[in-house]
């Protein structure tokens, strides 16, 4: 009986951890509203994009990306929906 309770307890903890992890892993990527449209064509485009996202738009990070359903390299600001940094 005790072993079944332990298994249920462990599964419950794993489920709670999974739900908690799943709710904090959405990485929001939005096109920069203030970066010049040709910023990603420059040799230091990623640095300029990141600086714009951090200082002006208050996102954690920024990078020149080609996202799915788009064809142009553009500056995107991004962070997790809880405010922490995420990878592009």
UniProtKB/Swiss-Prot annotation:
GO terms for cellular component: extracellular region. Its main location: secreted. GO terms for biological process: defense response to fungus; killing of cells of another organism. Residues 1-25 form the signal peptide. The keyword Secreted applies. It is found in: Secreted. It comes from the Eukaryota. Belongs to the DEFL family. This is Putative defensin-like protein 39. The lineage of its organism: Eukaryota, Viridiplantae, Streptophyta, Embryophyta, Tracheophyta.
